A protein has these predicted regions:
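Low-complexity, acidic/Ser/Thr- and charged residue-rich accessory regions of DNA metabolism proteins
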Residues: 343-441
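An N-terminally biased module of ancient metal coordination in phosphate/nucleic-acid-related enzymes
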Residues: 1-91, 96-99, 416-417, 429-431, ...
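Cys/His-rich short segments
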Residues: 252-336
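Divalent metal-coordination and catalytic microenvironments
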Residues: 7, 41, 106, 155, ...
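Histidine/acidic-residue-rich catalytic or RNA/ligand-binding cores of hydrolases
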Residues: 14-17, 48-52, 165-172, 203, ...
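Short acidic/histidine-rich active-site segments
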Residues: 210-227
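Extended substrate/RNA-proximal surfaces in nucleic-acid metabolism proteins
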Residues: 48-189
Length: 441
């Protein structure tokens, strides 16, 4: 089983860390337990040159960091992460009388193909100023261009529910794939859930039943890698990854943010501190009750709008052929019943380990003390995904403390309460358990 994070960025993208280099990406992939990492930003000429200089071919269509460039050894993570060529493209254009703003993830089988596609994209607009270029190009035409240059290219609509920049975004997206991609829609086989939605939310939209669901971090710094990830039960090669994502054969599931932690889960207006359920926002006609400005429509609201076949279910569960999959909207007065598609895959809800340590200790996740505890756990027990998902709670307690071990146990049991995210503000976590409060030294 491989853990893959296919959507990330380089330091050439706007608002990203200077440490987004091949060396640090390799290091943090090992810390996190990520086996396959997207390169991000393949359209940027300087980044492509750096990738060619610092990576070497591995299995067909994959790369790895040259051994002499490895920054440090991590005793519990001795594997060599693989890189797959990836990039995100922002397209802004008019279609059917409206301005559309859509982000798309593209995966390619090699840097040579990235060169050819980038040459064509440079004829459309500027690919030098931002690792995630902004182009005045219809998504339909971008998909056509990618497949013409490389029929094995994977085109995946990115974070499909984000309000401002996605295929289904409330403010500048579409109501269907067909409206966006027209006759090329059959070439779309997978979608990226994004941080503010999880599989049950996507399953509630009948039109998405034919698409594979993948999840990635969209990281803008190395430490944010693996916030979400995709599980692959395949061989290591571009061809096998292609098959898994395009057909589901070898796609084992996803690791998910709790959607309430995402920064666009609920409706609201951050400046005024107003966070609302979809029902409350509808009653207010989408207007902030404090300042009178327009609310940002959240992902939950948008999902409910497109889930046309949903019906009320007093039990608060999603009905499936094999039983009940728990899904409580939590912040909505309505529940949802959906027909779960046959291609559904398992998923696990996770939260970054530094945030759990911080919640247990009453500290900021960016504090020096949290970082020190994090590194100790990694060095003594294993990578972050192993700690979150598999390590014995007793071992975690022995290396750190009882309350940190309790926090991880709460995560595994789903005993987490969220103050939900809205209008660009991430949600905050509260662990629901009888904390064994110890001295935090």
């Amino acid at each position: 089983m491989y853990i893959a994070d296919l959507h990330i960025h380089s330091r050439y993208s706007m608002a990203t860390s200077k440490f987004l280099t091949p060396e640090y990406l390799d290091l943090w992939a090992r810390k996190k337990g990520i086996h396959i990492l997207g390169t991000g930003d393949f359209t940027h000429p300087l980044w492509r040159e750096e990738l060619k200089e610092k990576l070497e071919p591995a299995e067909p269509g994959l790369y790895k960091l040259k051994p002499r460039l490895r920054l440090a050894e991590i005793p519990s993570s001795s594997f060599d992460p693989r890189f797959i060529v990836s990039g995100e493209i922002s397209t802004i254009y008019k279609k059917n009388g409206r301005t559309r703003k859509v982000h798309s993830l593209i995966l390619l089988p090699g840097l040579d193909v990235a060169d050819r596609l980038s040459e064509e994209l440079e004829k459309i607009g500027n690919i030098h100023s931002d690792g995630r270029p902004i182009l005045g190009l219809d998504c339909h035409d971008l998909l056509d261009m990618a497949l013409t240059i490389c029929p094995e290219a994977m085109y995946i609509p990115a974070h499909i529910w984000t309000p401002h920049f996605s295929v289904f975004g409330a403010f500048s997206g579409f109501d269907s794939m067909e409206e966006c991609f027209e006759e090329l829609t059959p070439h779309i086989h997978a979608v990226e859930t994004g941080l503010s939605s999880d599989p049950p939310m996507n399953w509630s939209v009948p039109s998405l039943s034919r698409y594979q669901l993948i999840s990635n971090s969209d990281a803008h710094s190395p430490s944010k890698l693996g916030r979400e990830a995709t599980l692959l039960n395949t061989e290591l090669s571009y061809k096998d990854i292609y098959t898994a994502i395009q057909t589901g054969n070898g796609l084992a599931g996803t690791l998910e943010f709790f959607p309430q932690e995402g920064k666009y889960f609920m409706d609201g207006h951050r400046k005024c501190g107003v966070c609302l359920t979809p029902e409350e926002a509808v009653k207010l006609k989408g207007i902030c009750p404090v300042c009178g400005k327009k609310l940002t429509t959240g992902v939950l609201h948008r999902v409910q709008d497109l889930a046309a076949l949903s019906v009320p279910d007093p039990s608060g569960n999603i009905q499936t052929s094999s039983g009940k999959l728990q899904f409580d909207n939590a912040f909505s007065t309505s529940k949802t019943t959906v027909s779960i598609p046959a291609i559904r895959r398992p998923f696990e809800s996770i939260s970054p380990l530094p945030e759990l340590i911080a919640a247990a200790k009453g500290l900021s996740s960016s504090s020096v003390k949290v970082s020190r505890i994090y590194e100790t756990l990694l060095n003594e027990l294993g990578n972050e995904f192993f700690l979150l998902r598999e390590a014995k709670i007793s071992d975690i307690a022995a290396v750190s403390s009882e309350n940190i071990a309790d926090a991880i146990a709460c995560l595994r049991d789903g005993k987490v309460h969220w103050n939900p995210g809205f209008d660009g503000q991430f949600g905050t976590m509260e662990l629901v358990h009888p904390f064994r409060q110890l001295n935090s030294d």
